[in-house]
Amino acid sequence: MTSSTDSNLTLIPSPGDKVEITCLDLDRHGNGLARWNNWVVIVNDLLPGESAQIEFVRRHRNQFLARKVQTIETVASRRPPPCKIAKECGGCSIQHLSDHGQTLLKQGHLRQILLRLGQLDHKIEPIMTDYNRALGYRNRALIPLYRNSEGQLHMGYYRRGSHQIIDLNRCPVLDRGIDQYLASIKDDLQQQNWPADSDLSSGEGLRHLGIRIGQKTKQVLITLVSSTTQLSGLHQQAKEWYSRWPEVRGITLNIQRQRNNLVLGQETILLAGDLEIEEHFYNLSLLLSTTTFFQVNTLQAERIVSKLIEWLSTASLDINIIDAYCGIGTISLPIAATGYHVIGLELHAEAITQANKNALRNSLDNVSFLCGDVSLLLAKKLQRNDVLVLDPPRKGLDQMVIKTILSIQPERVAYLSCDPATLARDLKQLIVPNGPYQIDELQPIDFFPQTMHIECLALLTRISS
């Protein structure tokens, strides 16, 4: 091993070499980024502006992974993580950064990405955040399960960069109404002795525990995700939970036999109570099932819908609002409640079924939902005078969707993105000089405090043909 002084190192470091570095930024996983002799160095638990002695661990392509040996200088934005297992758990990556520090970091990252990938130098509004809800904001948990060869059940999220489970009995980012069940359910699952393996590497059995809560109604839905229905005493255990906790409205078993990155399967079996819970969202009553996609941060989702409705308020009620990638109607239904006629487009049939059910539940007859390939449906339904709302998955817009927008040129477009990189790519094609639109506003939203994720709403207006 070489000495700890930089002068004794060759231009290409070796594992075990030690140097002093200063952190320049964080990567998308929350790891510190630094440079040494033109090499990118990745080291955990280091914030921008902090310096430390690090030890090189291994080379990965044109980067070096390193571990922090000793902190030399810290920044004022560092804080003790609210969670005692934050340094090990892969669920949250920046709990050690203050709430204000997280806001500044995310604002800067969004600006860098839009400028680098989209050549977009537009004003970005202050991040829509709520420091009072930086913890306890998640309305849903999907927690891996594993029983080892000694029969001990492990329940928790994965250790950073591995499939090893870090046990937990509470999680600070989960709604406290979820937290209260974790320890008791874990104890009961331990006693039941059912096999459990989240990634099916050792056979069939339980894979995940799911808990969903209506943050306004406090109703709870508990789900066991399993690769098999052969779990002795399952119904009795479900009935016992149902009678033990009045807030629990349903217990379900979701079957997921596939070894992929999808936690939930398509088949859900009712064990006790009801298949759905009620949640109040933007003055509407919504039914949510085990597999319903619903924003995990209810209050922030309401705030972004409010922003959209405010933006729409100057539009004539005679136009159509086309909501592409509408899901269960989280955006469509509140807009319809203001009087606009809304057409929702969605690929997944189950989501459309729930959207129609929720429209009927709220007596909204000015909204309709169509199931199919969104790019094909949009080409058939979009008109020039319409307002288009886009809420695509992380991969962004299909090229056919962009071609349809550029061909028909609806008057206004709202694009809610969960990935700034694909947002930058898509906006570059829609904005002058490549397209007919100008940006009215870029509004970032922090749906996931304590993580590196940032979402952004782009509001566009047609200015040329």
Swiss-Prot record:
Cysteine disulfide links: none
Broad enzyme group: transferase
Residues that coordinate or bind S-adenosyl-L-methionine: Q295, Y325, E346, D391
EC number, as in UniProt: 2.1.1.-
Amino acids binding [4Fe-4S] cluster: C83, C89, C92, C171
GO molecular function terms listed in the Swiss-Prot or TrEMBL record: 4 iron, 4 sulfur cluster binding; metal ion binding; rRNA (uridine-C5-)-methyltransferase activity
TRAM domain location: 12-70
Pfam families: tRNA_U5-meth_tr
Keywords: 4Fe-4S, Iron, Iron-sulfur, Metal-binding, Methyltransferase, S-adenosyl-L-methionine, Transferase
Residue numbers annotated as active site: C418
GO BP term (any one): rRNA base methylation
PANTHER family given in the database record: RNA M5U METHYLTRANSFERASE, TRNA (URACIL(54)-C(5))-METHYLTRANSFERASE
Family as reported in the entry's similarity comment: Belongs to the class I-like SAM-binding methyltransferase superfamily. RNA M5U methyltransferase family.
Protein name (database record): Uncharacterized RNA methyltransferase PMT_0737
